[in-house]
Amino acid sequence: MSHRIAPSKERSSSFISILDDETRDTLKANAVMDGEVDVKKTKGKSSRYIPPWTTPYIIGIGGASGSGKTSVAAKIVSSINVPWTVLISLDNFYNPLGPEDRARAFKNEYDFDEPNAINLDLAYKCILNLKEGKRTNIPVYSFVHHNRVPDKNIVIYGASVVVIEGIYALYDRRLLDLMDLKIYVDADLDVCLARRLSRDIVSRGRDLDGCIQQWEKFVKPNAVKFVKPTMKNADAIIPSMSDNATAVNLIINHIKSKLELKSNEHLRELIKLGSSPSQDVLNRNIIHELPPTNQVLSLHTMLLNKNLNCADFVFYFDRLATILLSWALDDIPVAHTNIITPGEHTMENVIACQFDQVTAVNIIRSGDCFMKSLRKTIPNITIGKLLIQSDSQTGEPQLHCEFLPPNIEKFGKVFLMEGQIISGAAMIMAIQVLLDHGIDLEKISVVVYLATEVGIRRILNAFDNKVNIFAGMIISREKLQNHQYKWALTRFFDSKYFGCD
């Protein structure tokens, strides 16, 4: 369903390590690099984070049955160098058949090649959901049984590129309006027949006579009447024969250039989130930094000591994490109840914490440092996982996978855990994932041990200052200008905690 290809070395150099080189990012005040961000122009304007999967690049590939659409689509998917590319076949949207139509289908008397045979309304709804960054379910169709597979769907979320292929991919105006690039694969109908016979007999268990009968009665007439005219809707027409390599490569290069522009724009927006007017973000009532008590300061000192061994580091971090979590739990949902004391006295309308209304989502892997403390604080808590990593070439954050508790939107409080926040890019993306799953922003609380002011500023600007952040230690911009605090720009907590340093 998705393809992970090694990144190309030919990248725009001005964007390499924008989000990874935290020293440059912070000391230049989310700096204006290569003229990419004008702080004066952004002053007074509100910024809002738009994740890359909210604006996926959608490619439609149409053509007659057997023209080679699937081969062209597979070539594009394997070459465009985007990990989260989804290939969707319109064959999955064939309408389910009743008993009579199924009997006709097995006799090769049912017309699968007319437009009404495909549920284009459902196809449009699913593609629109992907275009809007929402989770969607793609049905699965079985040509062996001539029906949709019961209770089986392909769940898609977070796609950056969507490739739609099918005989009517370029037919419906609503689908065409969602596409960024439309391709028609042209082939002689005799070639289409030969390919179709090979495919249907080998892959779909059909007999030769039935295939030829269906071709002459339904496939060929509909190809001439309905499919061929969709050629006029295409942005590019390529031949389906073996000599189409040049045409396909030209299209692939065009797609790559468009995707690189899209990636660069994503990075520009992330940088812009940190370029708001220099107001004091650390004094807002939604930012909660652990009070610097003697115990807390001592724990900070021990955790930052290079000579502390792994076992002691884990012990002291768990201790500090428990303090931090206990502080964050002051805000959890409560209910009123009646209890009986050990002395058999009744207490009415007292407050009880609803721990079953609390869940946590760890950002792998630094968020996993909180696992022990979470289990000690709320033993039966449900925990989800998100894996977000930066592209090694561009620094762009990318969602690799998400494992969230069922019905997570019904919880009253969701803790989003991370060991360190430096640029804030991964946390911003993680919050957006939760929002896409129906969680109210007010229910989300970020829990982090170490954070920079730059990262916090980005998070607040991305979500209109509505995210509560509980931090063990926050490093201000002024402190970062002091070389003694340069250690705060290096990720080390998860490596130290898990003994990987």
From Swiss-Prot:
Keywords linked to the UniProt accession: ATP-binding, Cytoplasm, Kinase, Nucleotide-binding, Nucleus, Phosphoprotein, Transferase
Organism: Saccharomyces cerevisiae (strain ATCC 204508 / S288c)
Binding site for ATP: 63-70
GO biological process: CTP salvage; pyrimidine-containing compound salvage; UMP salvage
Catalytic EC class: transferase
UniProt keyword annotation of ATP-binding present: yes
Its EC number(s): 2.7.1.48
Pathway per the UniProt entry: Pyrimidine metabolism; CTP biosynthesis via salvage pathway; CTP from cytidine: step 1/3; Pyrimidine metabolism; UMP biosynthesis via salvage pathway; UMP from uridine: step 1/1
Family note: Belongs to the uridine kinase family.
Chief subcellular location: cytoplasm
Residues modified to Phosphoserine: 17, 276
Catalytic activity as recorded in UniProt: uridine + ATP = UMP + ADP + H(+); cytidine + ATP = CMP + ADP + H(+)
A molecular function (GO) term: ATP binding
Protein name, per record: Uridine kinase
CDD domains named in the record: UMPK
Compartments, record wording: Cytoplasm; Nucleus
Keyword Ion transport attributed: no
Job description of the protein: Catalyzes the conversion of uridine into UMP and cytidine into CMP in the pyrimidine salvage pathway.
